[in-house]
Amino acid sequence: NDLETICANFGGENIAACIVEPIAGSTGTLVPPKGYLQKLRQICDKHGILLIFDEVITGWGRTGSKFGAQEFGVTPDIMTMAKATTNGVVPMGVVACNDFIYDAVMDASPTGAVELFHGYTYSGIPVAVAAALAVQDIFEKDDIFNRAKNLAPYFQKGLFSLQDLDSVDNIRGYGMMGGIDMKLNTKPGKAGYECFKACYEAGVNFKATGDCLIIAPQFICEEKHIDEIIEKLRTGITNYQKNQKN
């Protein structure tokens, strides 16, 4: 409803686009409420606003589907991708758009001119494209997306089993991604950092954003690897709790 309010205050015709992550990743695996993205699509259509999905994190299987757009059944006008596009081997970013935007770019170009000038220093590197194509072949050959989808329920069950730990405030998860909020320590960010260190010493590494632990296992994991991750998370968080009492 915030977008609708902004449209009412400033005019939808003055808003070019709305960009969102299907699931906010680095801010703590924030899963949208049911129907949220569908409502966003409706508002954008109503006011002629382009809907952009940032699928840098959710793209290429992280949600259990190839893209978050497919998982939630919402089609954006523009989609951005990176990271898993090349499996991180070579940095690469990709932008996909619908036919309306594509045709607008192509038709607006003078005859004989480059349709979309994007010849920047780090753009269009052939080795990145080659890496992306090779990775896509592996995704298909090894059925990576279905592996992730099938493993996701087991991972989520293990993730939420940590809810009984005293220092854990909240847990969120979807597909092969999860966020564990730690209870506030003396100042914001301290609990997350101290818990990150304790878990690292226990043998598991992840990203901590503020007081949230971001857990995103590899798709090639097996159940035994998920068990190991959860066990070491429990050990690390428990050790963190003990250190706080000393």
Tell me the role of every PLM-derived stretch.
Residues 1-246:
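Conserved N-terminal phosphate-binding loop of PLP-dependent enzymes in the Aspartate aminotransferase
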